């Protein structure tokens, strides 16, 4: 547990890179950290190379990013926590947890390819998990000689964004080469700086739900010898500080109480973690096996575990990557809440025999484990590793 205090003088924003596999998300992440370290040197702005961001061994063996890398950097205006979201379709599950943490995202599209299946999927996921602001970085422009082709690709990206209710005509599109910027090409470094100015200006300072009761979805749990158990994740709303009493809610039938003995972010101690911060929370009296991913830390009494609710859902079409066939009563997919999948059964409204791809319907859901949910909690419906629907809890039933 580090002792250095975390600087809060600049607004803090969570962003990330999304887009199709091999379009240059990780290279762009490396370029942003490297160019900012050259142009705006500070304790925070440290260059990260491709291999350190692409860190987990299975990623490098397969040449695909799997886990979610967190890096930090700052512009003159802001402090950023940046997630390099996985690109490969098998790892969409991780993408969902990553995208859920973003105030805005940079959609990376290779100019050589244009939008690809995962470009569409990531735009859809951003829409589902509430990422409101996207900025487009058209990468690899150095490999395209034809100006008209670049214009065509840009139009195609804008149309795709509009299709998913993003303001496709107004979204900023920056064209450049992340690799050339990384290699020190001055003109391309300027473009990376232009991208960051655009991110500063286009993504508004997030409105934080600091006045609401604490809700922190647990992403990871580890123990520190002699100190206790740490639960980490992004604070969804509210605040947490030392000596606060919290409840651990969901998955298990009983609710546990714990006392917070430490809060840290980027290895620095915090007086208080607030909504939007990625923090580790040290809990007194909790064993490593008494808390798990998928649970939440919450202000006592503020949220309860439920297994039955009504949900308003949209079922994806085949073209959107959803099911090709309808589903019927008692369909049992996975429901993805915040950081975890839970199996549940679906009861259709009286008189509805089946639900077709593209339908919008109210369903009754019964989960096999209780989850901390309330009216307004969003979820994805998943089956065999792919998203087939998206929904919001409209009413708690049990």
Swiss-Prot record:
Family named by the database record: Belongs to the TRAFAC class translation factor GTPase superfamily. Classic translation factor GTPase family. EF-Tu/EF-1A subfamily.
Ligand binding (Mg(2+)): 26
Residue ranges of the region described as G3: 84-87
Binding site for GTP: 19-26, 84-88, 139-142
Species of origin: Streptococcus mutans serotype c (strain ATCC 700610 / UA159)
Annotated segments matching region G5: 177-179
Subcellular location: Cytoplasm
Catalytic activity: GTP + H2O = GDP + phosphate + H(+)
Stated name of the protein: Elongation factor Tu
Record function comment: GTP hydrolase that promotes the GTP-dependent binding of aminoacyl-tRNA to the A-site of ribosomes during protein biosynthesis.
An annotated Gene Ontology molecular function: GTPase activity
Pfam family, one: GTP_EFTU_D2
UniProt keyword Ligase present: no
Sorted UniProt keywords: Cytoplasm, Elongation factor, GTP-binding, Hydrolase, Magnesium, Metal-binding, Nucleotide-binding, Protein biosynthesis
Region of interest (G4), residue spans: 139-142
């Amino acid at each position: 547990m580090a002792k250095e205090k975390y600087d809060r003088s600049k607004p803090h924003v969570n962003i990330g890179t999304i887009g199709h596999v091999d379009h240059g998300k990780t290279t762009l992440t490396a370029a942003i950290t490297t160019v900012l370290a050259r142009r705006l040197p500070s304790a925070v702005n440290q260059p990260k190379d491709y291999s350190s961001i692409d860190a987990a061994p299975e990623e490098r063996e397969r040449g695909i990013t799997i886990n979610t890398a967190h890096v930090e950097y700052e512009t003159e205006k802001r402090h950023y926590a940046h997630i390099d979201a996985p690109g490969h379709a098998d790892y969409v599950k991780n993408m969902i947890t990553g995208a859920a943490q973003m105030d805005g995202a940079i959609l990376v599209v290779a100019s050589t390819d244009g939008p690809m299946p995962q470009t569409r999927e990531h735009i859809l996921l951003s829409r589902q998990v509430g990422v409101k602001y996207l900025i487009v970085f058209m990468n690899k422009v150095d490999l395209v000689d034809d100006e008209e082709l670049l214009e065509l690709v840009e139009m195609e990206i804008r149309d795709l964004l509009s299709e998913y209710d993003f303001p496709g005509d107004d979204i900023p599109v920056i064209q450049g080469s992340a690799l050339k910027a990384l290699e020190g090409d001055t003109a391309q470094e300027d473009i990376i700086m232009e991208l960051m100015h655009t991110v500063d200006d286009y993504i508004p300072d997030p409105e934080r739900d600091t006045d609401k009761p604490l809700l922190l979805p647990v992403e990871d749990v580890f123990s520190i010898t002699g100190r206790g158990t740490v639960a980490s994740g992004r604070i969804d709303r509210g605040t947490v500080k030392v000596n606060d009493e919290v409840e651990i809610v969901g998955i298990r039938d009983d609710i546990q109480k714990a006392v917070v003995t430490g809060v840290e972010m980027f290895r620095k101690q915090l007086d208080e973690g607030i909504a939007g911060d990625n923090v580790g929370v040290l809990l007194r009296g909790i064993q490593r096996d008494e808390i798990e991913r998928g649970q939440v830390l919450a202000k006592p009494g503020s949220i309860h575990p439920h297994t039955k609710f009504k949900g308003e859902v949209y079922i994806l079409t085949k073209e959107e990557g959803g099911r090709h066939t309808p589903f019927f009563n008692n369909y049992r997919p996975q429901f993805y809440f915040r950081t975890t999948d839970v199996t549940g059964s679906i009861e259709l409204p009286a008189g509805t025999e089946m639900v077709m791809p593209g339908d919008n319907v109210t369903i009754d859901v019964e989960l096999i484990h209780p989850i901390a949910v309330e009216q307004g909690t969003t979820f994805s419906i998943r089956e065999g590793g792919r998203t087939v629907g998206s929904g919001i809890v409209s009413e708690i039933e049990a």
